[in-house]
Amino acid sequence: MEDQVGFGFRPNDEELVGHYLRNKIEGNTSRDVEVAISEVNICSYDPWNLRFQSKYKSRDAMWYFFSRRENNKGNRQSRTTVSGKWKLTGESVEVKDQWGFCSEGFRGKIGHKRVLVFLDGRYPDKTKSDWVIHEFHYDLLPEHQRTYVICRLEYKGDDADILSAYAIDPTPAFVPNMTSSAGSVVNQSRQRNSGSYNTYSEYDSANHGQQFNENSNIMQQQPLQGSFNPLLEYDFANHGGQWLSDYIDLQQQVPYLAPYENESEMIWKHVIEENFEFLVDERTSMQQHYSDHRPKKPVSGVLPDDSSDTETGSMIFEDTSSSTDSVGSSDEPGHTRIDDIPSLNIIEPLHNYKAQEQPKQQSKEKVISSQKSECEWKMAEDSIKIPPSTNTVKQSWIVLENAQWNYLKNMIIGVLLFISVISWIILVG
């Protein structure tokens, strides 16, 4: 019915104060009170944005709102908005209910109204504004119970666009780029077809729409290149191009590292590869190997760990045998050179499958590398002097020695004896 010519929400001053405002303050919010007038904070919006918060569409350039009173300065209310402030002008005007229809039979003064003019901070030299608010107060209650007022926003200018509830302000606070349709303040064709108001400010609508349009233009201006990065091709081949189909409209900006998730993991693996030989204790004497692959005859001997750089590298990442693998036997204790034990050259860890398939080729490589580093072997054997009874266990490439605990135990005993001797000397002296 409100869309029909001649119909609309046009309450007079007595109805606003005696019915709507009184019921809102007393908590008797009937259906007509809640549906007709919305509750907003007047100072949170500039007037050209405030009109969009009204529940009723108006062709009279009038919009109605409930506003809670906020006395931040004693009895004075704070009326500062984003772009300006509301200034109180003139004297208050009494609101009377002549017949008592709106105030439950009470006839006489039921309230008063005051006029406020908006001062636009964008134009400090301009003292007058086309935006006016009539603020209605209900006076039949004590001052501390008057928690709400009714504000009637009015436009006094001559701009015909303001008469439409969907129109934009002729001088918005923030002027966006109007060259693009997506950057316009309000999409008028969409709003005219909708039955609700746009509750967003013109600034937000303009900037958010423009930002989305710019992002879509960037995607269109950067098509996918004809060839992919090799790493991308690797991942595309393994994953069937699933990630590309999910993001077909987006351009890949950063190359995807297929073998590793990030660069730090690659660096860490490289460091382990280069320094793995230092992770194994150099004082290894005899090792007890729990692999199912054992030599035909039990052997014993001391096998130092640091053979050569090339041999160590092949041990770790090329799945070949290592010179550090030795077999300990309690039947024949003693020290034996690795060159005298050919069977050790084919001993591999349990998880090493390639070495077990090619024992002869790996044996030749071990013999050649052992001959090249004969001097290093002699120096290593001279530096390692550990009793044959020392047992070591190699589990997951980590060497554990019982000799270390014996050494620590002897050191502790020696310290205790030294302390006891010093104490005895002090007591005797």
UniProtKB/Swiss-Prot annotation:
Compartments reported by the entry: Membrane; Nucleus
Biased composition range(s): Low complexity: 319-331
Transmembrane intervals: 408-428
Pfam families xrefs: NAM (PF02365)
Keyword check for Membrane: yes
Known function: Transcriptional activator activated by proteolytic cleavage through regulated intramembrane proteolysis (RIP).
PANTHER family (UniProt xref): NAC DOMAIN-CONTAINING PROTEIN 82-RELATED (PTHR31989)
Protein name, as recorded: NAC domain-containing protein 1
Organism (species): Arabidopsis thaliana (Mouse-ear cress)
Gene field: NAC001
